[in-house]
């Protein structure tokens, strides 16, 4: 697709989305487009500080959890002593960026709105860790907390997975991994998926959308994939291309959120249509006027706050 054939996205987004796009952080250095991944990670963490400010206060605990690869950091957000369930949150960032700090506000709001314990898992990033290591560490953390639930005073009888972007893929992939391998980590009550990628390699939205404003050009998407996967065969794995998994049975209830001007939107639409066609419990909601990653911007965007409330409400309705 020639760039000039793409939609004029920045002219079409909502007023509050435009406010976010035009928000300047004077103390922030320029994006290191040609820098190392380490420099890009550092910039991403700095840039997200502004958007994470003002989040709800609540009891927070940090634990290192053992896996076969080593220790993985986790952070527990506890809005009340007697939580009805536990939600595991997987951050976005194209598999190569992000951490528990970059998504702190999202996790706090999700905990506040659901009144469930939220556990953020700082899964290993790529390219240092290749598929399926992140999923294996996520599953290991879930199993650890299930086994140690009494010691950590958390309710693991009912759990859920949630994530944005690449984290949404990891959330659903982890739920399917537990199902397929018959691993008991508590009943999976629901999966919350904000603007994820689930296995499409081409689509209408991937052609019409994506640019420097969201870091999701076709070249960007290819770069993230090459960093994450170990080899070409992994592209067809049912835990990367989730459409190659069995979506006709025992899929936990899924809340699927799409951003109107996100090149990954067709992934969400296809996931919803596939699940619905096979009578798997699911809900799809499109958020008009939004770009990919809008969930970060709840300081300025009512739509971002609404999307988090919607996900929390969906999850608690399954309990």
UniProtKB/Swiss-Prot annotation:
<dbReference type="InterPro" id="IPR050300">
    <property type="entry name" value="GDXG_lipolytic_enzyme"/>
</dbReference>
<dbReference type="InterPro" id="IPR023508">
    <property type="entry name" value="Acetyl_esterase"/>
</dbReference>
<dbReference type="InterPro" id="IPR029058">
    <property type="entry name" value="AB_hydrolase_fold"/>
</dbReference>
<keyword id="KW-0963">Cytoplasm</keyword>
<dbReference type="InterPro" id="IPR013094">
    <property type="entry name" value="AB_hydrolase_3"/>
</dbReference>
<comment type="subunit">
    <text>Homodimer. Interacts with MalT and MelA.</text>
</comment>
<dbReference type="Pfam" id="PF07859">
    <property type="entry name" value="Abhydrolase_3"/>
</dbReference>
<comment type="function">
    <text>Displays esterase activity towards short chain fatty esters (acyl chain length of up to 8 carbons). Able to hydrolyze triacetylglycerol (triacetin) and tributyrylglycerol (tributyrin), but not trioleylglycerol (triolein) or cholesterol oleate. Negatively regulates MalT activity by antagonizing maltotriose binding. Inhibits MelA galactosidase activity.</text>
</comment>
<dbReference type="GO" id="GO:0005737">
    <property type="term" value="C:cytoplasm"/>
</dbReference>
<dbReference type="GO" id="GO:0052689">
    <property type="term" value="F:carboxylic ester hydrolase activity"/>
</dbReference>
<feature type="active site">
    <location>
        <position position="165"/>
    </location>
</feature>
<keyword id="KW-0719">Serine esterase</keyword>
<feature type="short sequence motif" description="Involved in the stabilization of the negatively charged intermediate by the formation of the oxyanion hole">
    <location>
        <begin position="91"/>
        <end position="93"/>
    </location>
</feature>
<keyword id="KW-0378">Hydrolase</keyword>
<comment type="similarity">
    <text>Belongs to the 'GDXG' lipolytic enzyme family.</text>
</comment>
<feature type="active site">
    <location>
        <position position="292"/>
    </location>
</feature>
<protein>
    <recommendedName>
        <fullName>Acetyl esterase</fullName>
        <ecNumber>3.1.1.-</ecNumber>
    </recommendedName>
</protein>
<feature type="active site">
    <location>
        <position position="262"/>
    </location>
</feature>
<dbReference type="InterPro" id="IPR033140">
    <property type="entry name" value="Lipase_GDXG_put_SER_AS"/>
</dbReference>
<dbReference type="InterPro" id="IPR002168">
    <property type="entry name" value="Lipase_GDXG_HIS_AS"/>
</dbReference>
């Amino acid at each position: 697709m020639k760039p000039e054939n793409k939609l004029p996205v920045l002219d079409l987004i909502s007023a509050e989305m435009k406010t976010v796009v035009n928000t300047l952080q004077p103390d922030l250095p320029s994006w290191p487009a040609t820098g190392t991944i380490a420099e890009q990670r550092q910039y991403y963490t700095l840039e997200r500080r502004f958007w994470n400010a003002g989040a709800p206060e609540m009891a927070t605990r940090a634990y290192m959890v053992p896996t076969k690869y080593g220790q993985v950091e986790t952070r527990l957000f506890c809005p009340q002593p007697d939580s009805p369930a536990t939600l595991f949150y997987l951050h976005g960032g194209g598999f190569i960026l992000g951490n528990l700090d970059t998504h702190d506000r999202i996790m706090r709001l999700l905990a506040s709105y659901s009144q469930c314990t939220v556990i953020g898992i700082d899964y290993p990033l790529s390219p240092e860790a290749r598929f399926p290591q992140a999923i294996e560490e996520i599953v290991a953390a879930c199993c650890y907390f299930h086994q140690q639930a009494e010691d950590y005073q958390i309710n693991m009888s009912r759990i859920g997975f949630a994530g944005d972007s690449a984290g949404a893929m990891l959330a659903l992939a982890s739920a399917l991994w537990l199902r397929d391998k018959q691993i008991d980590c508590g009943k999976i009550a629901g999966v919350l998926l904000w603007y994820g990628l689930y296995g499409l390699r081409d689509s209408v939205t991937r052609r019409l959308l994506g640019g420097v404003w969201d870091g999701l050009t076709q070249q960007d998407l290819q770069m993230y994939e090459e960093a994450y996967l170990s080899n070409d065969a992994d592209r067809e794995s049912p835990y990367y291309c989730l459409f190659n998994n069995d979506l006709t049975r025992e899929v936990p209830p899924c809340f699927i959120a799409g951003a109107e001007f996100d090149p990954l939107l067709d992934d969400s639409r296809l996931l919803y249509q596939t699940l619905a066609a096979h009578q798997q419990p699911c809900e799809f909601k499109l958020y008009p006027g939004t770009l990919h990653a809008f969930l970060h911007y709840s300081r300025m965007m009512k739509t971002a706050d609404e999307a988090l409330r919607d996900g929390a409400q969906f999850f608690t309705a399954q309990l």
